[in-house]
From Swiss-Prot:
Component of the A-type ATP synthase that produces ATP from ADP in the presence of a proton gradient across the membrane. InterPro entries: ATPase_proteolipid_c-like_dom, ATPase_proteolipid_csu, F/V-ATP_Csub_sf. It is a multi-pass membrane protein. The gene is atpK. Pfam families: ATP-synt_C. The chain crosses the membrane at residues 5-25, 37-57, 75-95. It is found in: Cell membrane. This is A-type ATP synthase subunit K. GO terms for cellular component: plasma membrane; proton-transporting V-type ATPase, V0 domain. It comes from Sulfurisphaera tokodaii (strain DSM 16993 / JCM 10545 / NBRC 100140 / 7). Keywords: ATP-binding, Cell membrane, Hydrogen ion transport, Hydrolase, Ion transport, Lipid-binding, Membrane, Nucleotide-binding, Transmembrane, Transmembrane helix, Transport.
């Protein structure tokens, strides 16, 4: 995807966030409006990063496994480390949403 599409993809998010924050019928705490977007970005970007990391580690791991079968445990650990990025994203989102600031 070309980088010229990025502003067109982010524009609806920013417009809808502005509209929804303007239509809030209740009082929100100072600075709370951005937490929902921040939590969503934390999960989404962490999932993208984990997908890239797991994809690269798994592709390299399959190449290693064709030559050395005894490296399976090591490769599995490297793939699991890449998946930990998504777990950290979920953890940060939960802390943002339910943490006391």
């Amino acid at each position: 995807m070309k980088k010229t599409w990025l502003p067109f993809l982010l524009l609806p998010l920013l417009v809808s966030a502005t509209i929804f924050s303007a239509q809030a019928p209740y009082d929100t705490a100072q600075g709370f409006e951005g937490l929902n977007i921040g939590a969503g970005l934390a999960i989404g970007l962490a999932a993208i990063g984990a997908g890239v990391a797991v994809g690269m580690a798994a592709a390299a791991g399959i190449g290693v496994l064709t030559e050395r079968r005894d490296m399976f445990g090591t490769i599995l650990i490297f793939v699991a480390i890449g998946e930990g990025i998504a777990v950290y994203g979920i953890l940060f989102a939960v802390l943002m949403l339910f943490g006391k600031f």
